[in-house]
Every structure is written in structure tokens, then in C-alpha cells.
From Swiss-Prot:
Localization, UniProt: Cytoplasm
GO biological process, one term: rRNA base methylation
Ranges of biased composition (kind: Low complexity): 12-22
EC number, as in UniProt: 2.1.1.181
Official protein name in the record: Ribosomal RNA large subunit methyltransferase F
Reaction(s) catalysed by this chain's protein: adenosine(1618) in 23S rRNA + S-adenosyl-L-methionine = N(6)-methyladenosine(1618) in 23S rRNA + S-adenosyl-L-homocysteine + H(+)
Source organism of this protein record: Ectopseudomonas mendocina (strain ymp) (Pseudomonas mendocina)
Family under the similarity heading: Belongs to the methyltransferase superfamily. METTL16/RlmF family.
Gene Ontology MF annotations: 23S rRNA (adenine(1618)-N(6))-methyltransferase activity
UniProt GO cellular component terms: cytoplasm
Gene name tied to this protein: rlmF
Length: 333
């Protein structure tokens, strides 16, 4: 394994980007405005069984119905990304696709800052998705949008089996997405990369909760809010057997981010940019402190907004501008 770089005498200050206007997606995000349900139903007829009229008289789906959300995601992936076959086992996270796409578009902009403003595209760009999950959503969107080569890593064999089935069912993904198991559940980056392997960026949506009980309470609260507190509403059965690693880890998000910061320094020579979503605002400052201690050369904080949800993307690198320029010359030319 390459040796960690020497710590800079004075860590560079974080470059903070103002969050976008509330509800505003990235300009390249395909999911602007209202959903075109007739077009979605055309590519995925089963969606028609789940379309309802919302209180504003517009077509929608019941986002508190897991079956409806899964079929809706399937239609979005088919309509916008050409993914014709997508399914996940019951009990796994069904991600909001517009928000996942926003993360990837912001990462593309990040790489462009080291490439004279041009987004580097194609299979020569390698991305490592930490916690790819059963849905494989980041590699699917990232490969379809930018042609990047993805490594999807997870600790759960069942999640990887689901992701492999998705990739195998869509021939256009062949060679563009590979999946690896992290054999040590206590590690994040360590043990995943070969000694001579280089990765241009990493991404992660870390587990938020600190325990299974906390995750259960949080999910129950979410379902009740979606159901508008209707006492007659039957809540879905919450099964966390398959998705425990997606929802919680000891110490919650903060502990995971601390470990990620520490491990990133140990593989710093192999990665250009590391990144992670951060759900809890107070954890951003904590992460900045851990990264300064680890010797990060630069940290960037990007605000993102989808509907009512505000989130943060934190990216960091152990390479200064000169080293990033050398990386570009050796890998992107």
C-alpha cells in the first residue's frame, strides 16, 4: 500500500458553495419539473396501476407505498437512463433517483475543476461507490450519464447479488460496472483496491442511525409523515434484515465519517477525490476537523436541494493543485 502523504503545515480552508435555491435540482439533472406520467407509463405499463390524483389534482403516486415507489423508480430508470430491467428484494432501500443523480452531477463538476472546466467522460474515469446496495443506483446513473467505470463495494453478499443481477440484465452495462465485497465490515476503503489501482473519485451515502432501534423509529416516523398521520392507514412491515448496513452502524453517521476520514489518508495516493453525503449538518464541522487532522490538502462543501430536503456533499483530496494537474495529465489525456 502506498504511504500516506505528508501533512501540510496548514490545512487549506474549506471552499463553501452556497446551497441552491430551495427545491432546485442541478441544471443537468433530467428530473426537472413535473413527472411526465403518460411517458413513464408508456415505458413501464405497470406504473399505471399505482398512479393516483394528489390533493392538487395532479397525477402522482403514493410515496408511502413501497411497491409503488419501486415501480416508479423502475419507470424512471427506463425512461431516462435506458435501464430496462431493474428490481430489488423486499426490505432494501428504494432511493429517490433525482437526489442520487444530483450527487453525481456535482461530482462531475468537481472533476471538471481539475480539467479546465471540461467534465472528464468515458471508461477511463474510475469511481468507487462505497455501499453500492442492492439498488446499484449510483453506478447505473453515473455510467449512463458520463460513461464512467464504476466499482460498487458492499459488505452484504445479498445486496451484491441483487446489484449483479441488475447489471447482468442490462447488456449495455457490461464492462462498465464491477462489484466487490468488502470482506471486513470494520473497514471502508482498506482491502478494496489493488496496490497499483487508481480511482478518480469515491462516493458514499453513509448509514445515518446508530442502532437498529433508532432506524426503526426513524423509518416509522417517515411513513407516518407520508401517510399524513391517517390513523386508518396500515403502515408497511418494516424489515431491516437485508438493509441493516444501509440504515445504521455503531455510532451512526458521525462515527462512519470519522472512520472514512482516517482510512482515506491511508489510500490517499490511490484516489484523487473522496466524497460523501452528510445528512446531519453538525457532522460537517466534525468531518472538517477529522480531515484536517488526517492531512487533507483541500475540502469542499457543496449544498444540494431536492424538494423540501436539504443535504450536503463533502469532498476532499490529499493532493494540491500541482499534484492534481499531474494526475490529470497521466490519466485523462
Amino acid at each position: 500500500m502506498p504511504q500516506p502523504p505528508k501533512r501540510p503545515r496548514k490545512p487549506a480552508p474549506a471552499a463553501v458553495k452556497t446551497a441552491p435555491a430551495k427545491g432546485e435540482l442541478h441544471p443537468r439533472n433530467r428530473h426537472q419539473g413535473r413527472y411526465d406520467f403518460p411517458a413513464l407509463i408508456k415505458v413501464s405499463p405497470e406504473l399505471g396501476d399505482f398512479v393516483i390524483t394528489n390533493p392538487y389534482g395532479k397525477p402522482s403516486i403514493d410515496f408511502a407505498n413501497p411497491a409503488a415507489v419501486k415501480v416508479f423508480n423502475r419507470a424512471l430508470l427506463a425512461q431516462y437512463y435506458g435501464i430496462r430491467h431493474w428490481d430489488i428484494p423486499d426490505g432494501y432501500l428504494c432511493p429517490p433517483i433525482p437526489g442520487r443523480a444530483d450527487y453525481l452531477h456535482n461530482l462531475a463538476d468537481l472533476l471538471a475543476t481539475d480539467n479546465d472546466g471540461q467534465i472528464p467522460r468515458g471508461a477511463g474515469i474510475h469511481a468507487l461507490d462505497i455501499g453500492v446496495g442492492a439498488n446499484c443506483i449510483y453506478p447505473l446513473i453515473g455510467h449512463c450519464e458520463y460513461g464512467w467505470h464504476f466499482i460498487g463495494a458492499d459488505i452484504a453478499p445479498a445486496a451484491l447479488a441483487s446489484a449483479r443481477a441488475i447489471v447482468a440484465a442490462n447488456p449495455q452495462l457490461a464492462g462498465g460496472i464491477e462489484l466487490r465485497q468488502q470482506a471486513n465490515a470494520e473497514q471502508i476503503f482498506l482491502g478494496l483496491l489493488q496496490a497499483d489501482e487508481r480511482v478518480d473519485l469515491t462516493l458514499c451515502n453513509p448509514p445515518f442511525h446508530a442502532s437498529a432501534d433508532e432506524a426503526t423509529r426513524g423509518s416509522t416516523r417517515k411513513w407516518r409523515n407520508l401517510g399524513k398521520l391517517d390513523p386508518r392507514r396500515k403502515l408497511p412491515v418494516l424489515n431491516f434484515g437485508g438493509q441493516a448496513a444501509e440504515l445504521w452502524c455503531p455510532g451512526g453517521e458521525a462515527a462512519f465519517l470519522k472512520r472514512m476520514a482516517s482510512e482515506s489518508a491511508q489510500v490517499a495516493g490511490q484516489v484523487l477525490w473522496f466524497s460523501s453525503l452528510v445528512s446531519k449538518g453538525s457532522n460537517v464541522e466534525l468531518l472538517q476537523g477529522w480531515l484536517a487532522k488526517a492531512g487533507a490538502a483541500e475540502v469542499r462543501i457543496l449544498g444540494m436541494s431536492q424538494g423540501q430536503k436539504q443535504s450536503r456533499l463533502v469532498a476532499w483530496t490529499f493532493k494540491d493543485g500541482e499534484a492534481r494537474g499531474a494526475w490529470r495529465q497521466s490519466r485523462w489525456r
